[in-house]
Amino acid sequence: MDQVVKIRVILDVEEDIFRDIEIELDAPLMHLHLSTLDAFNWDNANEMASFYQSNEAWDKGAEYPLMAMGPEFPSMENATVRDILPTPTSRGLYVYDYLRMWCFYLEPLAIGAAEDGVGYPRLMMEFGTTPDPMSREPEGLDDAGLFDDVFSDDAKTGDPEIDAYLDEDDDETPGMENIDDHVDLF
C-alpha cells in the first residue's frame, strides 16, 4: 500500500502562515509544487522554483529545480517527495520566484498508509492569510548603485592603451554630438 506524508508547509514571513498537505511519498515533486501553490492561493503564479533537502538548521542541500539543466540532472518531474523527505525527521525547503525569494519550510508531521478512495495531494489545514505573490519587491533590484560599474563614464579596464582609447574625446569634430547630426555625409 502507498504511503502518504502529512507535510507542514510554513511560509517564511513575520506572521504565522502555514498549510498542512497530505501527499504520497512517491509522488513527483511537481505535484507538491503545484499543490503548495494551490494551497497558498498562488495557483496563477508561474515563476521558477526549487525544492531542497535540508537539515535542522535549515541549510540548503541537494536541489530539485522546476526544470532540469539536462537529462542527467534531477528536477521536480523526475524526483519524488521521498527524495527531499527520506526520513520522518527530514526537513526540506521550497523556494518560489527567484526574484522575490519566497521561502517555505517543509516539515513532515506524520507518515502513514494511504486511505482507499482518497485523492492525493490534499489540503488538510490552513492557518493565516496568504500575501499576494507579487506583494514582495524583487531582491537586489532596488540597489541604487547596482549598475554603476556597468554604466560608469569613467570605466577603466586596467590596460593603459585601452583606457587611453576609451578616454579619447568623441567630439573631435566641432559641433558633432551624434552621427545623426550629419545625416548627409554621403
Give the positions of each predicted feature.
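Short linear regulatory motifs enriched in tryptophan with gly/pro/ser
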Residues: 1-186
